[in-house]
């Protein structure tokens, strides 16, 4: 690996995540790299984002209204040219913890154009979870070319963006399983032990993703919001203080 600058990409649009998520992603990334790193954030609202982040405005290409706040909106990153990006770029969602060095994500099979975390709820189905993926800018234009003519048709056919991308690309490569974990699916003890044991962080974990509920702050406090009271019988998490050690 050369001393060339590494690029981490995050995307923030809508109101689900505030600027503090971008700022913490920047801080966590900088603590967990030994190389020059530039953090790029594409957003529709740069308010409050720390000045060290390379902020770019989210392109406003024509989309059906129901897709404007859907993950499919990030398909623009698969165009031939994307302002501020080049080479192999590591994309991270905002609802995750960086708990170990991210340099290995750039070093892992660098000749490949796309590497992704395997989706924790679909093992063996060749579907990635696009909260964590690395891609070569400009090399995957067939994703954009397939999406752009009829976005709604792709959404209706595949329902979510990660299935669409992985099925469009065909056979995909996954990062080592122990690097990318789901808090909910990998770390919370199975019922009924989740009522008695707090989640622990494996030593080889580099990324912990918080897909769905609980959110990062809720998991720290030991809260798991539910919409139906009977779900409290099994949806439970103990307070998990190690989250706060990284989420800063």
What are these model-derived regions, one by one?
Residues 24-35:
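Short, acidic, metal-binding catalytic loop of nucleotide-sugar glycosyltransferases
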Residues 86-95:
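Short beta-strand-to-loop acidic/aromatic patch adjacent to the donor-nucleotide binding site
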Residues 44-85:
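Active-site-proximal specificity loops/subdomain of glycosyltransferases
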Residues 98-128:
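Conserved donor-nucleotide/metal-binding helix-loop-beta segment in metal-dependent transferases, i.e.
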Residues 74-75, 112-113, 129-133, 206:
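Small-molecule pocket liners
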Residues 16, 96-99:
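A short, conserved beta-strand element in the Rossmann-like catalytic core
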Residues 1-21, 35, 41, 51-58, ...:
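A glycosyltransferase accessory/donor-loop signature
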Residues 45-53, 105-109, 125-126, 219-221:
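Short loop/helix-cap segments at secondary-structure boundaries that form the rim of catalytic
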């Amino acid at each position: 690996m050369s001393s060339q600058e590494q690029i981490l990409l995050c995307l923030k649009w809508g109101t689900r995540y505030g600027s503090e998520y971008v700022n913490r992603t920047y801080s966590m990334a900088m603590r967990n790299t030994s190389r020059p790193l530039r953090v790029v954030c594409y957003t529709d609202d740069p308010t409050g984002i720390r000045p060290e982040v390379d902020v770019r405005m989210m392109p406003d290409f024509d989309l059906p209204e129901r897709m404007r706040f859907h993950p499919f909106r990030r398909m623009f990153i698969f165009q031939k040219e994307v302002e501020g990006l080049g080479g192999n770029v590591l994309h991270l969602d905002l609802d995750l913890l960086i708990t170990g060095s991210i340099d290995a994500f750039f070093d892992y099979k660098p000749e490949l154009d796309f590497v992704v975390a395997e989706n924790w709820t679909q093992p063996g189905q060749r579907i990635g979870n696009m909260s964590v993926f690395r891609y070569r800018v400009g090399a995957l234009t067939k994703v954009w070319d397939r999406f752009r003519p009829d976005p709604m048709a792709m959404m209706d056919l595949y329902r979510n963006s990660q299935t669409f991308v992985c099925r469009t690309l065909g056979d995909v490569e996954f990062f080592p399983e122990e690097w990318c974990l789901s808090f909910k699916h990998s770390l919370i003890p199975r019922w009924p032990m989740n009522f008695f044991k707090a989640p622990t962080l494996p030593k080889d974990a580099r990324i912990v993703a918080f897909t769905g509920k609980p959110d990062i702050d809720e998991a720290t406090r030991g809260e798991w919001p539910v919409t139906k009271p009977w779900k409290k019988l099994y949806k439970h998490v103990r307070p998990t203080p190690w989250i706060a050690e990284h989420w800063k």
